[in-house]
Amino acid sequence: AFGGPHTTAFPDTIPPRVDYVVQGEAEYVINDLVGGVYPSGVILRTQRIQNLDSLPRADYDLFMNKKRSYQFTLPYSTRHPIFNMNTSRSCPLACSFCTVSDIWGQLWRAQSAERILDDILYLKGEYNIAGVYFREDYFPASKERVYKLCELLIKSNVNIVWACETRVDAIDEELIKIM
């Protein structure tokens, strides 16, 4: 089975020996795919999930304590483990050097600040994470969401470090201070 950005951007390059291809988001088809519901050779084109808060929390037990763990470090922090999170999809921008809008379109969707905090508190309580790295295309696409998340993190007194990916022109001094 193939999935991910490649299947959307370059569907003609997928080898014929591949049994299944998912173009789009797989959360609502993955169980049926693994369960053999679809015939071999099918290309599944899924709709965009509009409300990312509606997705269930991932079953972190499947991978958090494995030998090849999804726990990372950050170069500027001695604290670990750091857990990667992806709380949004796509990007509202269309930078000439980037393929994100070609793959996802410019329909940016995101989890709410409340959902993100809930997941962070869960990961802190269950796995004692030291921090989070928001691995997504454009974390501060909604400054309002970033401010709200920062306020919730401060109010909750959760002791973590965190980092995100952004553009220099997307942040200002006020946002940096609360982050």
Residue ranges and their predicted role:
Residues 1-56:
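Glycine-rich beta-alpha loop elements in corrinoid/cobalamin-binding modules
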Residues 60-179:
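Radical SAM [4Fe-4S] cluster-binding motif and immediate context
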